[in-house]
Amino acid sequence: MSRYRITTLALVSLLLPTAWPSAQAGRGTQQRPAAAAPALRPPARADILRGEYGKHRANNDLLYYQLDIRIDPDQRFISGKNTVRFRMLEDDTRIQLDLYANLNVDRITLGERELTYEREINAVFIDFPETLRKGREYSIDFYYSGTPQEKGRFGGIAFRKDPNGKHWINTACEGEGSSIWWPSKDQWRDEPAGMRLSVAIPNDLVDVSNGKFVGKTDLGDGYTRWDWLVQYPINSYNVSLNIGDYVHFGDRSGDLPLDFYVLPGSLEKAQKQFAQAKPMIEIYEDIFGEYPFAKDGYKLIEVPYSGMEHQSAVTYGNRFANGYLERDWTGVGISPKFDFIIIHESAREWFGNAVSAADVSDMWIQEGWTTYLEALYVERRFGPEDALKYINAYKSKVGNRQPVITQRGIHRTPTQDMYFKGALFLHTLRSVVNDDEKWWRVIRDFYQRFKYQNIMTEDMIRFFNAELKQDLTPIFDQYLRRADLPTLELAFDAEGGPLAYRWRADERAFAMPIRVGGPEKWEILRPTTDWQLTKAPMPKDSFEVATDLYYVNVVKQ
């Protein structure tokens, strides 16, 4: 998406008197003020217990989960245990795990010894009779049972029937949390290095979960146990069940197995629609590197909701049609060229599952990057012109009423701007870099540097500042920590004199170069938050700003 004939605009810096803007007020119309941001409700105790990485979470490091459960679909009942292996980072006698209050804690054991615990809302504080020592590894068995509640957009865990009346059970709990259906360390910062899932269900059903399928065992009581092995770090909300009357077909992308699971009546449609997965994976591998969960494979699984990015087990409910739920998602004719759910949810394998946010407040690292990856897919698949149309269409979806990054330590999903403003910020940053070869290298290196890690925005800022050898912190902060967009103020002289210009931004140090002039000869203007003058006159009528390459407001006076 590069522009041509880019030069640096000659200018002279001049700190203008504060009266300058009002003296020019008659030359244009000021931007309409944005609507006031809605007041945020005070965090509930449950939000803090879920979101805070407090003492009894921070004192240990997850190593491994072994989740062994049994599901009775008729009774909507789940029972089993999670074996949790962890290493202590500090001496202590208590750790925190999580399980929704409506589910029973049957018992928690360390070896043969039953442990005491205290429940507060959905938190479970587990006490040990002796001090757990820093550096040592421990393993506990957490037995539980109950009827999970359905909650949230996709149910958290939902018990449904398919069109043929057979049981169809699916989990999708990014917002609600893994503890809605299984005991876990239900937060974003700490992930086990891997896990094993064993799911016992009636013989006529199939379970598709995360990781590599390692076998099934007939238990002799009308139930079959399905075993899956996850060989990479995984966030607890990504752990998933997909239980139903599934049929399977497959493909390969090089050495990577592509496994597809759908209901029998969907097979013919899926064989056609799911063909989009292979070129999508090839495009993302070309940009960022190998598919991050190669040993576990890639799965695409039909579900009764729109879709979710479950690691190595991406779920799909987009009606086997291009666009999003048979709509032109961006309204500019590009979305109908591809299946939005396949492209978006699979992109989360790279950003969200491999590179993960360490706190829900930084969720834009997952959703903003993934939305930007949609545009990169369009660029590689359909060309730069379509990519520009596609990403600029996201501007209409941004509210700019609250910051993208929210308060840390509170489990509160940020504004939906994290998707669209996050993507448009990255699109803008590419134009700031103004060197596509460098941009492709930096984003690939960023991904490779933080693959299989949980990070915060500060980690990204430090990386980009070091790689690009400039301080981009004020630009990051204006777009992500402030609600308002930066506004480029242009004050033209009525008598044909020099142009006065500056950024109006909340970040005092905000200084972002931007392309101006016109398509025949774009030039780089370097505004700061102080007024400056160009050396040469600038005609108002023919003066353009490359707003398709930057997400900014422009006010001409």
Tell me what each language-model feature is.
Residues 80, 171-174, 185-343:
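Hydrophobic helix-coil surface modules that form long, contiguous segments used
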Residues 23-79, 162-168, 473-474:
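N-terminal, polar/Ser/Thr-rich
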Residues 134, 143-196, 244-252, 550-557:
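Glycine/proline-rich low-complexity spacer/linker segments in large multi-domain proteins
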Residues 81-102, 183-187, 192-202, 458, ...:
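Surface-exposed beta-strand/loop patches in extracellular or lumenal glycoproteins
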Residues 231, 363, 367-428, 432, ...:
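Acidic/His/Gly-enriched intrinsically disordered linker/tail segments
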